[in-house]
Amino acid sequence: FADGKGSTYAYGYTKKQARKTEWEWLLDRIFEKGKALDALDQCIEQEKKEIGKPRFKHKVVLGIAIPLSKQKDWGSIDGTPLDFNRQADQVKAAQWYIDQLMSRFKKAKYKNLELSGFYWVDEDIATCKDLPKYVSQYIHAKKKEFVWIPYWKAKGYDQWKELGFDIAYQQPNHFFTKDIPDSRLDEACELALRHGMAMEFECDSKALYDCEDSSYDRMLAYIKAFEDHNVFETSAIAYYTGSKGLLDLYHSSSPEDKKIMDRLARHIVARRSIKALTK
């Protein structure tokens, strides 16, 4: 989560901490015409001509840039310089960013998108500690949801409710490391159920059947585990697909890629159909 010029918006990416200037650049990128949210809105508008108008707006969850502890050069709000050694200043910066996201989203007047909540991009609380709890209070006051996706057994994963999150998705962290056995997926599904968590489905373009060092079988293992544990029927699911994993699978001419895409698509369509019937 960085700007491509060396500045980071979360822990663990680069050493240079993003300042208010970089936060504003990120906001401009999120709401840039023809990109990101605007492109998504246009895409849905185009598809409506083919499949008809849905009975709902697509819900959007936007990530929050993290106020990085010990940062002193972030900038000012209302003329007051902020020091992220102080948690109160971290909360103030997060509130400012949330306000910016909400204001710009409203101003954009998207036809097909609804801002439903915010996502905490840190995948553990080793450094941010209990900061999410105080940010959550502001988010809930705005009547929005607070979402988290901790990595496998990350610090604080089993405290997600106490930290103020409305939903947390368990990352199996299986797809990308080939020496992790498929049993990790069973364990992740069971762990998520035990702690009241949802699940994340992970893949990228390495899932292509004919690509070098293919991870096709690992994506297949996710689908099988989710079927075996009734995740598709009973759980919320977040999908991490790299930059264009599903797009590459869609464009592939391989029969095996079509087979796995169809298998996943059937579950997604069934989930949407069930949801529509219950409304």
Where are these regions (language model features)?
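Aromatic-lined carbohydrate-recognition surfaces of secreted/lumenal glycan-active proteins
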Residues: 55-73, 77-98, 114-125, 136-157, ...
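Alpha-helix N-cap and loop-to-helix initiation/capping positions
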Residues: 35, 82-96, 127-130, 180, ...
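Alpha-helical scaffolding within the catalytic cores
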Residues: 98-106, 133, 151-159, 183-188
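Surface-exposed amphipathic alpha-helices with a cationic face
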Residues: 48-52, 102, 131-145, 189-193
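Substrate-binding cleft of secreted/luminal carbohydrate-active enzymes
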Residues: 153, 164-279
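Aromatic- and acid-rich polysaccharide-binding/catalytic face
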Residues: 110-124, 157, 161-179
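N-terminal catalytic cores of secreted or lumenal carbohydrate-active enzymes
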Residues: 1-92
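Short helix-terminating capping/connector loops at secondary-structure junctions
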Residues: 51-57, 110-115, 231-234
